[in-house]
Amino acid sequence: MATNVLNSIRERGFLDGQFLIAMPGMFDANFARTVIFVCAHSEDGAMGFILNRPQRLTFPDVLLHLQLLDPDEVIRLPSTTREFQIQAGGPVETGRGFVLHSDDYLSDSSIPVSDDICLTATLDIVRAISRGEGPVKATMLLGYAGWGPGQLEAEITQNGWLTCPAQEELIFSRNLDEKYDRALALMGVSPAMLSTDSGHA
């Protein structure tokens, strides 16, 4: 059912489940050389997450801040849990956390955003990850990128973004520095081929 809905949206020209790849002419420092995964797009605007910006906070920092664990419990966490990746998802609501994850984990608050990827923004998934009971693939993002009605479409028309279908492996890759060039490679494009004033895909 979710897949049918997503296909219908794409047929109407919306970009749910797509990558936005910033063109060289993107002079807004918030978005220069970014790869964004679009989670929602309609006549009312768009929402997505930057996939290649690091975040200083660690997962133990988040657990302590939310008072989900005490310091002694955090110390005893397995290294894979302590190193769970947190990224800066965008300039809007930077104190709010979101988890993009594979669809093997679902709660009442999980929202499908592509055929195999869901979004959960409640504490239940943070608790599950801290207990080793979370999804197989996941990344936590603080903040998001948002656009008002028609804003994203205008930016694309003005050659601000390239677009292409998202790739799950790239979404969850921990190698943030490589994501921009790898996203371009999905389209058969290299950074050297782009100019600040040439077209979008």
Swiss-Prot record:
Residue stretches in coiled coil: none
Pfam family for this entry, one: DUF179
Classification via InterPro entries: AlgH-like (IPR003774)
Cystine crosslinks: none
GO cellular component: cytosol
Top-level taxon in the UniProt lineage: Bacteria
Family, similarity comment: Belongs to the UPF0301 (AlgH) family.
Protein name, UniProt field: UPF0301 protein Smed_0532
Organism: Sinorhizobium medicae (strain WSM419)
Organism lineage string: Bacteria, Pseudomonadati, Pseudomonadota, Alphaproteobacteria, Hyphomicrobiales
